[in-house]
Amino acid sequence: MAWMIRDVPKDSRPRERLLSSGPESLSDHELIAILLRTGTKEESVVQLAQRLLRHFEGLRPLKDATVEEMTNIKGIGPTKAVQILAALELGRRIHQSGCADRYVIRCPEDGAKYVMEDMRFLSQEHFVAIYLNTKNQVIYRKTVFIGSLNASIVHPREVFKEAIKRSAASVICVHNHPSGDPTPSREDIDVTKRLAECGRIIGIELLDHLIIGDQKFISLKEKGYV
């Protein structure tokens, strides 16, 4: 018979602790244990949650796990895997929808905050354009391309076509460095200068080009390239 949360000592049960102290008081593995609900014949649900996190080396890799990868772990079937992935996806969508509600970008820090949680864990480079109105409110966001940044690939037409369509007053470009190091490359700088020049010609300003690393970023405007 599988171990369940009720089989854990009462003062250690995640559900009871959440009710008495709030969700913020629980550790990552305790929150996952609530989603899993049951353990295995050999271990409690809390122990299973701990093993799951150890296997993926924390929440960050777990966020990108597939159902197949999760079900390779003893004690994690399709139902448990789907429950965890659904919860992680809801968290991502809540964060995204909160930011998208006419988010105002007044400085590089605002822009980085808007995309950081979505982009800092990506395993490939994503080049994103954020379109703003005259009040610097976000009106649209588009992933222009996925792959290594190259001046021959990032064509200004693809960036500014959407800006014209959306009647945007300005645009902020963002891309991530999967290495976690946001230091700009020569290609990053060349692409930025090209986009800024095109923006000046058509009258839609490139406000900035942000490079996202792991919990850090660089503004190419602050570096003098815009």
UniProtKB/Swiss-Prot annotation:
<feature type="binding site">
    <location>
        <position position="188"/>
    </location>
    <ligand>
        <name>Zn(2+)</name>
    </ligand>
</feature>
<dbReference type="InterPro" id="IPR025657">
    <property type="entry name" value="RadC_JAB"/>
</dbReference>
<feature type="short sequence motif" description="JAMM motif">
    <location>
        <begin position="175"/>
        <end position="188"/>
    </location>
</feature>
<dbReference type="GO" id="GO:0008237">
    <property type="term" value="F:metallopeptidase activity"/>
</dbReference>
<dbReference type="InterPro" id="IPR001405">
    <property type="entry name" value="UPF0758"/>
</dbReference>
<protein>
    <recommendedName>
        <fullName>UPF0758 protein GK2618</fullName>
    </recommendedName>
</protein>
<dbReference type="Pfam" id="PF20582">
    <property type="entry name" value="UPF0758_N"/>
</dbReference>
<dbReference type="InterPro" id="IPR020891">
    <property type="entry name" value="UPF0758_CS"/>
</dbReference>
<dbReference type="InterPro" id="IPR037518">
    <property type="entry name" value="MPN"/>
</dbReference>
<dbReference type="InterPro" id="IPR046778">
    <property type="entry name" value="UPF0758_N"/>
</dbReference>
<dbReference type="GO" id="GO:0046872">
    <property type="term" value="F:metal ion binding"/>
</dbReference>
<keyword id="KW-0378">Hydrolase</keyword>
<feature type="domain" description="MPN">
    <location>
        <begin position="104"/>
        <end position="226"/>
    </location>
</feature>
<dbReference type="InterPro" id="IPR010994">
    <property type="entry name" value="RuvA_2-like"/>
</dbReference>
<dbReference type="GO" id="GO:0006508">
    <property type="term" value="P:proteolysis"/>
</dbReference>
<dbReference type="Pfam" id="PF04002">
    <property type="entry name" value="RadC"/>
</dbReference>
<keyword id="KW-0482">Metalloprotease</keyword>
<feature type="binding site">
    <location>
        <position position="177"/>
    </location>
    <ligand>
        <name>Zn(2+)</name>
    </ligand>
</feature>
<keyword id="KW-0645">Protease</keyword>
<comment type="similarity">
    <text>Belongs to the UPF0758 family.</text>
</comment>
<feature type="binding site">
    <location>
        <position position="175"/>
    </location>
    <ligand>
        <name>Zn(2+)</name>
    </ligand>
</feature>
<keyword id="KW-0862">Zinc</keyword>
<keyword id="KW-0479">Metal-binding</keyword>
